[in-house]
Structures are given as C-alpha cells and as structure tokens.
Amino acid sequence: MDDFDPTVTNSPKFRLIAVQCLFSITAFAAMLSQRHGLAGPDEMTLEECGPQACGYQKFSNFKFLIAVCIIYAVFSLVVMAAYLLQRVPPPVTELTAYTVMNVLLFAAFAMSATSCNITIVDPVYPVCKRATSAKASIAFAFFTWLAVCFSMLFTYKEWRDVDYHVPGSGAYEFVPGVTSGSSRSSYPPQASSSSYA
C-alpha cells in the first residue's frame, strides 16, 4: 500500500467530490423512498394507483434520475479511490468524464423538474405537490450538478497549469495551455535534457 496517500483528503477538490457523492446518494435514495403521493404521470395511471397516488416507478424521468445519480455515485467513489491510490488520470481525461456526467445530471434534473411541475388533476395541483421526497431528490440532483460544474473548473485549471494538449490537435494558440511554436507540451511534465547534464 505504498501508493496510498491519505493526505489527499485535505485537498479541496477531493472534498468536493466527496460532497458530490453524498448529494447523488441522497438524490437517488430520496426518489426511491417516494412510493406514493405523485399526482400522475397521467389521469388513467393515477386512477389505477388509487387514493395514495402513484410512486416514482410510474415515471420514466424519475427512474432516469435514479439511474444517473447511482452511476455518478459509483463514478465519484472510483475517482476518490484513484486520488487515494495516486492513480489520477490526465486532466483532459478527467475533464471529459466530468463533462459527460455533467450533461447527464443536468438532463436528469431538467426532465424530472419538468415532470414534477406538470398538472394532471387540476391547474393548481402539480404532480409533486404532496411528494416531498421527490422534490428533495430533484433539489439534490441540482446541487450535485452544480458541484460537478466546480469540479470541471478545478480540472480545467489543472489542465492549463500543466500545459496539457489534446493528442493530435497540434500546437495551436486556441488550445488551452498550448502555445504556438514547434515545441509541444505533455502530461505529466517531462524533465528537460539540461537537467541530466
């Protein structure tokens, strides 16, 4: 276990990932607990659910939110393990992964929030009017997405700091961290030949 580094837990970025993991777990757990109380997804299904109204199982958007939050919780645990074992991927790889998860989280939040606010029974009675757990789940999904945005900013800054470039992109000025010229930067930084003299 020589590669294990417990001091990484002091890093703001590591702690932010831990918060994201907690938020995503809370989001899918809250939605899983919403077994009734949802006034929808349509009038016919609502009648079939009975007087206690429907659970999250009747909503494809809510099930999508659960799936995305579970995936992100697992993803964040893997990332934290990589940090602890000093097996952190290059910033461009990490940024790409965060971008994909960011899109999925925002889509899950937006779709669920839309489903939560539509009206089936009457214009003043939205689907989630009495569904406290569903509303909490959607809120925590939003907080997770927002926290991931900050992780993307941290990772982008690291990308620039190490002068990383996209393989095959060439040394163009518009690529973050890469300047024009004949020399190309790499990650991790390589020792110059003069250091061996």
Curated annotation (Swiss-Prot):
Belongs to the Casparian strip membrane proteins (CASP) family. Residues 180-197 have a biased composition (Low complexity). Residues 35-63, 121-135 are extracellular. The keyword Iron-sulfur does not apply. The keyword Cell membrane applies. Homodimer and heterodimers. Pfam families: MARVEL. The chain crosses the membrane at residues 14-34, 64-84, 100-120, 136-156. Keywords: Cell membrane, Membrane, Transmembrane, Transmembrane helix. It is found in: Cell membrane. This is CASP-like protein 0U1.
